[in-house]
Amino acid sequence: MIKGRYEDENLKWIPLLIGLVILIPFALKGMTFSYKYYLYILNTVGVYIILTVGLDLLSGYTGLISLGHAAFMAIGAYSSAILVDQVGLPFMASLIVSPIIAGLFGFLVGFPALRVSGMYLGLTTMGFGFIIRRLIIAMREWTQGSGGLVVSAPEIFGFTIKGDWANYFLVWTVALLVIVAVRRIVKSKIGRAFMAIRDSEQAAEASGINLAKYKMLSFFISGVLAGLAGVLMAHTNHFISTDHFDSMLSIYFIIMVLVGGAGTVYGAVLGTVFIVLLDNLFVPELE
């Protein structure tokens, strides 16, 4: 509880950072250089934040390592692309169904967490990522294999979300809602159970916490959020392929969480903003 108060007192400025990120495109539009690339980067930041706050819930708050979150993202992305463009499901329905599908896979992957931990669990989740990648390639009739899949623009209440600005506000609206939702989870009984498991499984079990239930729940929620990020990535980028979801991306996500500070929702946000901007804006300038 002391740690929670410490986070609240020292991270109050992070919402201001989020506000600045949202307002930046308006400043960019008035400049002489093309702002579309920068808007694309900010869209990427928003999508990744949805995933990393979920990963932080799993790794930072529950203490379970995952090196396969790119796979959950791929499941959400491909599920939505297939459901919307091939099955005919409305985008708003897919926005709910596809993340749940990813969450169910997360639930299944969570079973090893009942028996193994640490890097053994990390390697297990990484292996899951390889399996999903091969499965996507094998399901060529639905996924077009390694060639990639063209994805339609999202349609909400009869309005097609097209263009950089529309995509931007869709992504960031969802991202902010996810941040608020995860903060509420962290401060709830569920969040306290997650942190108790992270701090000491033996003590948590002795206090009456069902370890299996909460570990599986953590994997499920984290998988749902990764799948949600995948849905938005697919329908705003309009193209997905297996190259977008390789194992290095999962490690990339872990780095974001660690840089911002594992076990803090806003830390995951800050780490994501920092790493994506560093990778896309500053590193290319040094090459």
Specify the residue positions occupied by each region the protein language model found.
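Transmembrane alpha-helices and adjacent helix-loop boundaries
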Residues: 1-287
